[in-house]
Amino acid sequence: MSCKEDRSTPFWDTSLSENERLDWLLENMTLDEKLHSVSSGGYDLERLGIPGHNLGGEAAHGVEARNDQNGFGKPDISTSFPQPIGMSASWDTELIEEAGRVTGTEARVIAGRHNGQGLSRWAPTVDLERDPRWGRNEEDYGEDPFLTGEMASAYVKGMQGDDPNYICCAATLKHFYGNNTEDGRGWKNSSIDPRNRNELYLEPFRRVITKGGASGVMTAYNRINGVPGILNPEVQTILKDQYGLLHAVGDGGAMALVANVHHYFGMNAETVSAALKAGVDGMSDRPDQVYSAAREAYELGLLKEEDLDRSIRNTYRLKIRLGLYDRKSRSPYDRLTEKDLCSDHNRMISVKTAEESIVLLRNDDHLLPFSANEISDAADDEGKLAIVGPLSDVWYQDWYGGIPSYRKTLRQGLEEVTGKSIPCAEGYDRVIFRADGQPVAVDDDGSLIVGKEPDEFYRMDWGSGNYTFRSVRTGKFLTSGLYDASEHPERLGKISAAADSPFDWFVMEIFHLEKNGGGTSGSGSSHKENEGGTFTISDRFRRPLAVRPDHTIYAQQKDGRASVFTMEVTADGTKEAVNLARTHKKVILALGSCPMIGAKEEIDRKTIMLPSSQQKLIDQVTEVNENVLIVFITNYPYSFMEGGKTASGLPGDLLQEGVRRAKAILWSASGSQDMGTALARTIFGLSAPAGRTNETWYKRDDQLPDINDYDIIKGRRTYRYFDGEVIWPFGFGLTYTDFTYRNLSLAMAGPSLVEASFEVTNTGSAVSDEVAELYAVMPRTRVPRPLRQLVGFRRLHDVRPGETVQVRFRIPTAELSYYDTISGSMMTEEGDYLFFAGRSSADRQTQKVLHIPGAVPGKRDTACRIRADHYDDYENIELTEGRFGMTAVSLRDENKKGEIVFRDCVLGDEATHGKLLLKSKRGCRIQFLVGDKEVLAFRGDTASYVASASFRENSLNEGDRAPERWPAVWDEIEFSLPDVKEEDRKNATITIRMEGDVKLLSFRLFRPDPDAHRF
């Protein structure tokens, strides 16, 4: 930023109101300056002496200030907390607010180093985790909108601070909305009906804006019901007009995607215009591209200056509240200093957050906690404790994490807590390669070459065919050259041992091995098979590796010859781990994931199964040692099931045998600088675990619908609707003591407020935290309701043995509402509601029923227009863009029939006809059913056109004008109703069956007026 400030103008005058300062700004900006200011990049108004200050930056779990993308150069260190999925597992809103406060404080300090840049951060992510295969699972807060809303609100409150006039660091929620698929996220459509939208997908945003006070929202790349996220009018109509949101931005590059990927518009000018009118204030594409698009939009008449003014007013209002334009600083956050960065206090919050995020999933025979006398020197052949597994002694960087001042691996944490050296075996095989018969080695400059004595590599199997290889001799990872190709074309595709860790936007340390003759090499293959087989090896982009004449190895850029590789296992890593486990009394088996491999931004998981190499470790380690603690360091749930027989002797699912043998299991997310310390303190009882799962750990892949299916209700997703068996349910977590729940009491405290209280007693022998959870079960009603729904939770701290804590909640009855597709509004239905309290969503220790007053569902008046997307049920349907403020119903697969169902319909006594408002280009067939009475309502399209007279008295002669083919139009198609019994007219079920190319907006029933076409 090189703009020279001029603080003499009224814009810098803090004695004026925000609106007065903004009025002056808009009155004095030129049109060209306004067009430049549509970019979120922060355009300097040099003529007015007003620096732009960009809006952007990340803060998912602390400030991301690596500075590897923004041109600032050297990283700024910051405190790194657990990934959001981990922070949320603490179920501690007060602590997460403190973590947010540390994040906001450090963002403010770091911004002071960079002329105020980075005070509006794109965090937190509040997209619902409806599917554990989502690649960005780590960034979110769980599968429940209430938990997400409470936890993310706390983080936002901490980030933004509590000053009534100034914001410490502005929080921008991601990604509005229906963003839960990475593969194809730039063009796919999220089909979301009104119930899913209002009850689930909008809820985290509503809660974190209205309760947490989030300043901004970032739109999603994907389409929502046919409309690209950056063009979604709900940004204005819902987020701003209803929730009170201040500011909205598009995701990085989202403007260009509309034309280049969605092909929704042909020009960026159209996108800028539509986005601004939809309520998006800033485009996060290249500033020069945004300016060109805005300039063209204005010249074409697509944009008016008032559209620009509205956007600029929102953007600069936020910047004023950040204190960026005070003539004399009045913001309390400007008093923060370098001492507030990575301070002792911040580290204390980091350790506490990491500890509270740990979830104890199993503790048979009270294996945990370990005691200090169970540690011996590593030189002791009959040692007491060892650690094995691929996550034993490693700390992986994630994309949205910052650079902390230190990082603690699990092994380092154990050694820090115990003061002893802990023997370790990662369990990786060591292998050597031959390419076209020649040994593969690492040259002095790191290049991978052939012809020298072969080098050994650690083979790391991450599942789904993803491998990394680390040189045993140099410690560097193999990587495939991608960048600097323009200046150094010789680097493109070059394979070298040059990376310290798998990390970058494109993780070029990933390789794939394909057996010649078909198949992928898996870690379950025997050594003999590996030694005897030949392979094609390819890089992250599936470019096959080949030896060049100069003996170097490259990834081929085009269809070139692939070298034939052989791989020989020189050391069996599993055997080494097993031998270590066999000679120690207790073993910690550290398993999990690397946040840059297999699941990340742009990459979804293909399976929830634990990689076979890790399953193999579990099998063999637990076979030789009966005291195994498994520590999962991962940001998403795994499954580890096998076929077998249930207790009744019938075929069923069983936990894999090795997992069953493990006596204790802990789960921790990655990302915290104190991850290893927190785990070690928990293992040795210096901290008592009380975290809870925030998403379901399913048993099998086939329990999950298509990842592209966004219907949580019909798809039976999440704990709210899934009725099958799971490994661990939502809200589950054990402690080192026992707790009982009793005496649930319920009462109405007014017409729309429930008061609930119950007792929680520590019946064990250890002091511990406990997360008290309260759920509601909805009465049977005309539509599917949640099987259970979280309505209250509280983390109780340091509950002593024998102590009883009274837990109270005040629950607005609106928490029990659902979207009524008949009235088109949220409704709390009158009825008997069951409430239960316990330690998870599956634990009903104390329960009670309360009658809650409310509304009674009505009937559908078919004389009024019925929106097609307000159905009660459907098959093979996708929602897409409509018109007239309505969403269109189309077929997901045009080669199959589809239908929508409307129950509780009332037909007028005289209704004899119906009208369908639809559009069809290639032709469709629609059947209309009232009960079991059926009529063919329409067959054809709305593109064919035959001219007709305006009035039947003035008809054209037949043949005066031939039929023509035009673009399809929205048309109301009239049809006759089937004969319906009188009693069926009072409570009918209407089904509309569709075939072909159709977009249906609505229907209504009526009796035609015979005189309607007369003067």
Model-found features: residue ranges?
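Glycoside hydrolase catalytic-domain context in secreted enzymes
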Residues: 1-818, 833-837, 841, 932, ...
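Short loop/turn segments at connectors of secondary-structure elements within structured domains
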Residues: 115, 167, 689, 766-770, ...
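A glycine-anchored, Pro-Gly-centered beta-turn/N-cap motif
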Residues: 465, 476, 533, 543, ...
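Extracytoplasmic
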Residues: 525, 832, 841, 851-1015
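A general secondary-structure signal for short beta-strands and their flanking turns/coil
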Residues: 751-755, 769, 804-806, 830, ...
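Terminal connector regions
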Residues: 813-855
